[in-house]
Amino acid sequence: MKPSHAAWILTALFAVAVSASVYRIPIQVSDSVEILEAVDKTPSIAAAFTQGLYASRTMLRPMRQTVTKGLLDAAHALGDRYNLVFRGFHAATAAVLIGLFTLVARPRSWADAAALAFALLVLTGLHTFTGMVREAYPINHFLLVAIYCLMVFALAQARPSTWLRAPRRFDATQGRPQRVEGRAKSRGAAGLAVDVAACACFAIASLTLESGLVVATVAFAAYAAGLRGISRGALVAIAALTVGYVILRVGGLHMIGNAVGERQTGFGTAMLSTTDLRVGFGGRPWVLYAYTILSSALTVPLSQPIAGQWTAVGALKAGDFQQLFYLNDICTSLVATALAVWYMSTRGANGRRRWRDPIPLTSLAVLAGSAALSYAYAKSEIMSAAGVFYALVVFLAVAELARRLAAGTSESLRLPVLVIVLCISSAWAFRAVGLEYRLQRGAFDARSEWVLRMPPYHDPPVPETDARLTLRLRDEALYRGRTNPYLLWPRFGRLWGEN
């Protein structure tokens, strides 16, 4: 078996495991039912897009309504099977993300395959990944943005030289190779298709979620690092689209940004309410913005703070420090980050520092861009794309370390090194297993919402006179039982945390 085949088999196993757990989560009540009911009343996909343009004064996300309308039409065509369509779409996108991760990593050797196994544990074990695949509103736009980022980077990895030159074929009559006429145009068309696809990914991502603007940083950082799959003309087009986005948002739709106190966020060891934020930072918002940007940038490499809140420090002060959870999360993150920093500080075959290579440089750009976009409030999901590229850097670091250890480790040191590697991998595997627990808990919570947030316990999210889908959605959610994870023994919540 070739190493690349083993890598793709491993990728498929991860994709199936994550997708199966994602599919079990019912369509949630909060942030979903109202959108579904409103979009279902629109006559067409174009009308849904138009509705999305004017749905909010702060959020420009018309592609959410557009995709939702397309999925609703598909569900109606299948006999109103909403759970099948929406959860199937969610599960499929989770599998696509993991597949794109391996496609971008490009494992070729057995060292690469081993490093990929570790990197997939890092990817699925990060707290940013949990939020990215668990929530859906009613589609998971954070997951879609991460997919668009990987797609643009994969397009940047393409080799344009093969598109611009017509291939040569040996001509016996001339005694030398001759260019094959008519082939150059088709190769040039392929290059144009890549540019168009990159621009389309950015346009769709930016209209899906505000953090979709980070897709532009992927394209520019990849080009700055030496990748030429996306041409300079396409970068100019992406820059023009960015300007157009700002003009549409500010000049055309008169939208405003998120102000202090619109959403709760963490500060220090506390989670502040919207009222607390207005009182504490209403006159000096720059303090909150600076803290939120910094804490968002730290949450990927350190797994702390969570949504701006230093939960480990707060738990230690309160005497509720969950040793296994916090120590495992923080220590494994420190080890992975140390490997990434070591790798980026080394020099490649060309003599330059590896932080300037495509994946590390893009990872730094996405981390900075995502943190800047989360200035108003910290949220782990906003940093999910940065978490994906962080795991890619860890892949490169582990692959390089494996090659060096295989070539230079003496017989007496191989066993201790193997034990250390096994311990670190097992710790990350423990974190990755926690993803399955959190997804199972998310499925139970989403199902419970259909009881606790509906009459007689709560007013319905949509008035009964306007509800055309709610009863069917509730029946589908309650039809299949979900295990109550809070009754499991031992208390898995203390092993994998509540974040």
Q: What is the predicted role of each segment?
A:
Residues 30-80, 250-337, 384:
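Membrane-lumen/periplasm interface segments of multi-pass, membrane-embedded glycan/lipid transferases
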Residues 214-247, 251-256, 266-270:
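Perimembrane helix-loop-helix junctions
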Residues 101-129, 145-146, 361, 365:
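Transmembrane-helix signature of polytopic, membrane-embedded enzymes
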Residues 119-120, 337-374:
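Transmembrane alpha-helix segments characteristic
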Residues 88-112, 150-154, 337-346:
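Transmembrane-helix motifs of polytopic, lipid-linked glycan transferases
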Residues 140-142, 369-370, 377-400:
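Hydrophobic/aromatic-rich transmembrane helices and adjacent perimembrane loops
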Residues 412-499:
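Membrane-embedded, lumen/periplasm-facing catalytic core of multi-pass transferases
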Residues 192-209, 216:
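Membrane-interface alpha helices of multi-pass inner-membrane proteins
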